Curated annotation (Swiss-Prot):
The lineage of its organism: Bacteria, Pseudomonadati, Coprothermobacterota, Coprothermobacteria, Coprothermobacterales. The gene is pnp. GO terms for biological process: mRNA catabolic process; RNA processing. Transmembrane segments: none annotated. CDD domains: KH-I_PNPase, RNase_PH_PNPase_1, RNase_PH_PNPase_2. This is Polyribonucleotide nucleotidyltransferase. Belongs to the polyribonucleotide nucleotidyltransferase family.
Length: 697
């Protein structure tokens, strides 16, 4: 019989109660932990296949993250009333966890590992991604999966000059910094950050502050691991047959000849030809040669050759110095008709970005734990197969594309003007036309150009660069502007984006077991020099935002008192429909009374705005207005000063001379000048068309 026993550790991190519990739930998983920060609870499970897949050349890790609607007391929307495919937010949080734990698995491991995080309860204060990240770290620690080193993760905010560990949702709304860091006791393995143009010193200080919090959580996880006391499993890892590896290493000169070339296509062609030839040569010597093993050994020798070449020549495979950027090119407004466009080229990486401006009806509604908002700035990243010269099926955006799109969006979001300044919904799409490293940072640059091309009043350009790292024996070499080969064979992909004023986004992925803050400090310094050069090119392409395109809609924002919303809309939407018919402009009204008037011309928008303002306005006695006759009888007329806003005009108030019948002097549709003579307690109006008499002095 399975023994169920709650094994629990409790501590306090950032003034909040933290609990890790194991041994009672989900016991058929290799490891399962119920993690609780405050009243936000995640069940994190990890599973490992019993047998490795030795015929593949990668580590088969899958990470999923699910936010359950019941966690916040909601029933899912839609016809089926149940959770469906993961949202973009869930995918991004799954990637956050994946990137944190992937470097920690043993080299050569080929057992399938699946990580599943379910958010079971949420207090709307403590962000669940940090709970799930640490739940995963704890589940791996108590499992039999052979990860030798413990990790943990924290979020750091920066409010009023002070760092805040694991801030609440409310605190994050006030923070200049949203920094998520995962790491071991002494090194960092993952960073995801957005920042309001902060100085490098704030980020470096945030990383050091994060490490203190990480150690606190690791102490709790270590205590739980000791209490559970489960030994680690013995697994089979891929190891190279030494004789075959030595044979391949004897052909390092051929590797060098194929790899050392500045043109990506030429290099790939030469490497492909070498691979085919070497495989046939080795088959003759080693008849039992396994193709998957050959591919792994080939990649290992590639890595060794590239690193040795850099070490000995102090140059990179394309001839650049370690801190040298590839040739840059930027151009604005490259497409007709679209609201804005920008092209950015760095070496053999090329991105075309476009901007489309819309109204409030075009916003995206985000409904996630701790976040319900109308998202008015969206960036989407598209990576077609032709960008790498490959033939692949197209099946919608991949997790990678969603992740890259979000990174660019975060880098730009701090420069997007507020709704009060620019009442538009903004959609940016980045099309990767060529890829040879750091397409996300090229997308940031192209998007910055496109936004200014569209007339979005951004204060400054945003540029980005990807930094790499090569660890070779006792030396760490930081590389500026890594290309695809250096990303593939290197130890770090560190993306840094920002303006001339400061940093707006960071993203770090590593392939080693961690990187020191000192190395990252050096990389940020090197990135700032490169970013300055890139920004010069962006400003040369378009120094400031252009006027709105003629093809872009015209939008103005109006504040409507909440108690007047029904009056503006009218019965069955009659008033709004009529304004649209008469002016050609459309009106979107939010529940809080904020309205957006959208039209193709300034004239139509202003006409619609004036009509809305007249509906909302309470005319004062004596105020002169223009009215339209909507009904005429012999003794009185009904006149309208705005759609749905009418009053009475008596026959005696039309002329100083006697009129037998109003039907003789007025007709429906006629426009006349009137003034407010009376207004009763219910707001009903009586007008006069007589000339106003001057008050006696």
């Amino acid at each position: 019989m399975i023994e169920r026993k709650k094994i629990e550790v409790t501590g306090t991190v950032a003034g909040k109660k933290v609990i890790f519990q194991s041994g009672f739930l989900a016991l058929q998983a290799n490891g399962a932990v119920l993690a609780r920060f405050g009243d936000t609870v995640a069940l994190s499970t990890v599973l490992m296949s019993s047998e490795p897949k030795l015929d593949i050349d990668f580590f088969p890790l899958t990470v999923d993250y699910e936010e359950k609607s019941y966690a916040v007391g909601k029933i899912p929307g839609g016809f089926f009333k149940k959770e469906g495919r993961p949202t973009d937010m869930e995918i991004l949080k799954a990637r956050l966890i994946d990137r944190s734990i992937r470097p920690m698995f043993p080299d050569g491991m080929r057992n399938e590992v699946q990580v599943l995080n379910m958010i079971l309860a949420a207090d709307m204060e403590n962000p669940p991604d940090i709970v799930a990240l640490n739940g995963t770290a704890a589940a791996l620690a108590v499992s039999d999966i052979p990860i030798p080193e413990l990790i943990a993760g924290v979020r750091v905010g920066y409010i009023d000059g002070e760092y805040v560990l694991n801030p609440t949702f409310a605190e994050m709304s006030e923070s200049q910094l949203d920094l998520v860091v995962a790491g071991t006791r002494d090194s960092i393995v993952m960073i995801e950050a957005g920042a309001a143009e902060v100085d490098k010193s704030i980020l470096i200080g945030g990383l050091k502050f994060a490490q203190e919090g990480i150690r606190q959580i690791i102490d709790l996880i270590a205590e739980l691991k000791e209490k559970v006391g489960r030994p680690k499993a013995e697994i089979t890892v891929v190891s190279f047959p030494q004789e075959q590896l030595d044979f391949m290493r004897n052909h390092e000169d051929r590797f060098r000849a194929a790899l050392i070339t500045p043109i990506k296509q030429e290099r790939e062609r030469a490497v492909s030809e070498l691979k085919k030839a070497l495989f046939q040569e080795m088959l003759e010597v080693f008849p039992d040669l396994d193709e998957a093993m050959f591919n792994l050994m080939f990649g290992e020798v590639e890595k060794e050759v590239v690193r040795a070449y850099m070490k000995s020549t102090r140059k990179r495979v394309d001839g650049r110095a370690f801190d040298e950027i590839r040739p840059l090119y930027a151009e604005s407004s490259v497409l007709p008709k679209v609201h804005g466009s920008g092209l950015f080229i760095r070496g053999q990486t090329q991105v075309l970005s476009t901007v489309t401006l819309g109204s409030f009806s075009d916003v995206q509604f985000i409904d996630a734990i701790g976040l319900e908002e109308f998202k008015r700035f969206m960036h989407q990243y598209d990576f077609p197969p032709f960008s790498t010269g490959e033939v692949k099926p197209r099946r919608g955006p991949s997790r990678r594309e969603i992740g890259h799109g979000a990174l660019v969006e975060r880098a730009l979001s701090y420069l997007i003007p507020s709704e009060e300044v620019f009442p538009y919904t903004i959609r940016v799409v980045s099309e990767v036309l060529e890829s040879n490293g750091s397409t996300s940072m090229a997308s940031t640059c192209a998007s910055s150009i496109a936004l200014m091309s569209a007339g979005v009043p951004m204060a400054r350009h945003v540029g980005g660069i990807a930094m790499g790292l090569i660890e070779y024996n006792d030396e760490n070499v930081v590389l500026t502007d890594i290309q695809g080969l250096e990303d593939h064979l290197g130890d770090m992909d560190f993306k840094v984006a920002g303006t001339r004023e400061g940093i707006t986004a960071l993203q770090l992925d590593v392939k080693v077991k961690g990187i020191s803050v000192e190395t990252l400090d050096k990389a940020i310094d090197q990135a700032e020099v490169a970013r300055s050069k890139i920004l010069d090119v962006l400003y040369d392409a378009i120094p400031s935002p252009r006027p709105l395109s003629e093809t872009a809609p015209r939008i103005v924002k109006i504040e409507i008192p909440v108690d007047k919303i029904g009056e503006v809309i009218g019965p069955g939407g009659r008033n709004v429909k009529r304004i649209t018919q008469e002016t050609g402009a459309t009106i979107d009204i939010r529940e809080d009374g904020v309205a957006f008037v959208k039209g193709l011309t300034d004239e139509s928008v202003n006409m619609a705005k004036q009509q809305v303002e007249m509906i909302v306005k309470d005319p004062e006695v004596g105020e002169e207005l223009t009215a339209r006759v909507v009904r005429v009888t012999p003794s009185y007329a009904i006149v309208e000063i705005a759609p749905g806003k009418t009053g009475l005009l008596h026959v005696s108030e039309v002329s100083e001379t006697r009129i037998r019948s109003l039907e003789d002097v007025l007709s429906v549709g006629q426009t006349i000048k009137v003034w407010v003579k009376e207004k009763d307690g219910e707001g009903r109006l009586r007008f006069s068309a007589k000339e106003k008499k001057s008050e006696a002095h």
